[in-house]
Amino acid sequence: MRIALIAHDNKKDELLHFIKRYEHVLATHTLCATNSTGRLIAENTNLMVHRYQSGPLGGDQQIGSEIATGNVDFVFFLRDPLTAQPHEPDITALLRICDVHNIPVATNFATAEILVESVL
């Protein structure tokens, strides 16, 4: 499976903890991420991660393009719902493209754990 990993700044440490917990599962899949999320994962795990631009610089749109062309099967997008994001339209577009292409997307840990435990 091809999995995209994205996290807002206030969720990056939590995502890293989640990824470390399931590193043995994620290691068998192809991973991509926005730049700073991917760098954090690469520096703190043994996982290989293809990195796109940071979200505000177009990374969300790059991953959206990968979804639209059939190159992503799952998205883990841990959003910070309590902090306004300057690139909110890009985030909305990414979630929309997931819906258009019927791509499962986890925006919180409960959903992410269900996906990992039941599908991956």
Swiss-Prot record:
This is Methylglyoxal synthase. Pfam families: MGS (PF02142). One of its GO terms (biological process) is methylglyoxal biosynthetic process. One of its GO terms (molecular function) is methylglyoxal synthase activity. One of its GO terms (cellular component) is cytosol. It catalyses: dihydroxyacetone phosphate = methylglyoxal + phosphate. Its EC number is 4.2.3.3. Belongs to the methylglyoxal synthase family. InterPro entries: Methylgl_synth, Methylglyoxal_synth_AS, MGS-like_dom, MGS-like_dom_sf. The active site is at 60 (proton donor/acceptor). Residues 1-120 form the MGS-like domain. Keywords: Lyase. Catalyzes the formation of methylglyoxal from dihydroxyacetone phosphate. It is an enzyme of class 4 (lyase). It comes from Natranaerobius thermophilus (strain ATCC BAA-1301 / DSM 18059 / JW/NM-WN-LF). Substrate binds at residues 8, 12, 54-55, 87.
